[in-house]
Amino acid sequence: MSTFIGQLVGFAAIVYLVWWYVVPPVCRLMRARRDAVRQQLTEAAEAADRLVEASQAHTKATEDAKVEAQRVVKEAVEDAKRIVEQLQAQADVEAERIKLQGARQVELLRAQLTRQLRLKFGHESVRQAAELVRNHVADAVQQSATVDRFLDDLDAMTPKGADVEYPLLAKMRSASRRALVDLADRFGAIAKSLDNQALYTLAGELVSVAKMLDREIVVTRYLTVPVEDEAPRVKLIDRLVSAHVGDPTMEILRAAVSERWSANTDLVDALEHISRQALLEVAEREDQIDEVEDQVFRFSRILDVAPRLAILLDDYAVPADSRVRLLCNVLQSASSVVNPIAVALLSQTVELLRGQPAKEAILFLAEVAVARRGEVVAQVSAAAEISDAQRTRLTEVLSRIYGHPVTVQMQIDAALLGGLSIVVGDEVIDGTLSSCLVAAEAALPD
């Protein structure tokens, strides 16, 4: 019994301990577990709800995506069609432009090739024609016939007048022109009372005074001041040169400074002109004017073919006396004797170049010599020497055309091939075969 009671007490104690120390934690654990399960069930329910919502959203999104995709595809198809149409239109326009451009280029190339062909054909035709002409005029008779044909054409020209005057007048203005004419008349009156030696002296003294005035610009400017009272100018020239020149020269100088001149240099030109007239007067008295004129002109042609000599005569770094000595040495070495009057005229011209090229100054001198006789000078170029009959006929024809006696100055240029080229003053009559060939070539298309 006691054992039973003991066991009962022990069991009661164990129950007590279990109730107080085991049951509460277990209960709490069970409650916690229950709450956890309940919460998990709630969360599972919520997750299921969310899954349903997600499924619904996915389904809706899928349907929306399909609709959007269909819309995008439809728009893309429409855009593609529009782009294709635009590209096709642009391609058509570009193709048409390329066709037009190609057609223009083909036409341009065709025109260019045609022009080149014409040009080559034209040049070849001119070359062949030139060759035929050269072969034709190689015969002296045929070449002479070209001159005759030109003279026939020239003879048919309408006559027209040409006034003959001192070439220097063409370079001067009205006041100087009147002054030069008056001075030339004064010289003509004085020259009647002078012998040839006095005219030589007059020419030399006038050249010396002209050289002095060319150096002394201030003096020249004072002597050409356009005032009514010429007494101070006459007094000045008397004081400067009366002790060094003769009375005829002083008379010319007084008359010169009494005139009104348009430019300072015209006075020097006038004195040079009168000095030339003095020498040409001597040549006329001695019946040598034709020889003097021909030799002066021939020397101008020499300067054409000897440019080195022209350069030496133009070299102003060399004193004028040295250039005159060079001129005299050249003339002395000539195969024929040079007329002393021609030598004097050429020497004066070289001394008084005053910036003018020697070739132009000497050619101008030849024109002065011709003009003194009231003749027109015609510079004629030919491919070969013309016959005396042709020269006579040319002189007669030109004299009828210009209404004055004409002096023909010939020069030979084989490059002219045939015909003649005539220069009278500023007028050129070109009837050469070479000019016809050049004109034919110039008329070819570019």
Curated annotation (Swiss-Prot):
Record keywords, A-Z:
ATP synthesis, Cell membrane, CF(0), CF(1), Hydrogen ion transport, Ion transport, Membrane, Multifunctional enzyme, Transmembrane, Transmembrane helix, Transport
Q: Which domain of life is it from?
A: Bacteria
- Does this entry carry the keyword Manganese? no
* Record GO cellular component, one term: proton-transporting ATP synthase complex
Q: Per the annotation, which location comes first and is thus the protein's main one?
A: membrane
Query: Per the UniProt record, which residue ranges are transmembrane?
Result: 4-24
In residue numbers, the region (ATP synthase subunit delta) covers: 169-446
Any one GO MF term held by the record is: proton-transporting ATP synthase activity, rotational mechanism
Chain residue ranges for the region called ATP synthase subunit b? 1-168
Q: Does the keyword Transmembrane apply?
A: yes
What subcellular locations does the record give? Cell membrane
Known Pfam families for this protein?
ATP-synt_B, OSCP
Identify its membrane topology class: Single-pass membrane protein
Complex formation: F-type ATPases have 2 components, F(1) - the catalytic core - and F(0) - the membrane proton channel. F(1) has five subunits: alpha(3), beta(3), gamma(1), delta(1), epsilon(1). F(0) has three main subunits: a(1), b(2) and c(10-14). The alpha and beta chains form an alternating ring which encloses part of the gamma chain. F(1) is attached to F(0) by a central stalk formed by the gamma and epsilon chains, while a peripheral stalk is formed by the delta and b chains.
Q: In which family does this protein belong, per the annotation?
A: In the N-terminal section; belongs to the ATPase B chain family. In the C-terminal section; belongs to the ATPase delta chain family.
| Function description | F(1)F(0) ATP synthase produces ATP from ADP in the presence of a proton or sodium gradient. F-type ATPases consist of two structural domains, F(1) containing the extramembraneous catalytic core and F(0) containing the membrane proton channel, linked together by a central stalk and a peripheral stalk. During catalysis, ATP synthesis in the catalytic domain of F(1) is coupled via a rotary mechanism of the central stalk subunits to proton translocation.
* Protein's recorded name: ATP synthase subunit b-delta
Query: According to the entry, what is the taxonomic lineage of the organism?
Result: Bacteria, Bacillati, Actinomycetota, Actinomycetes, Mycobacteriales
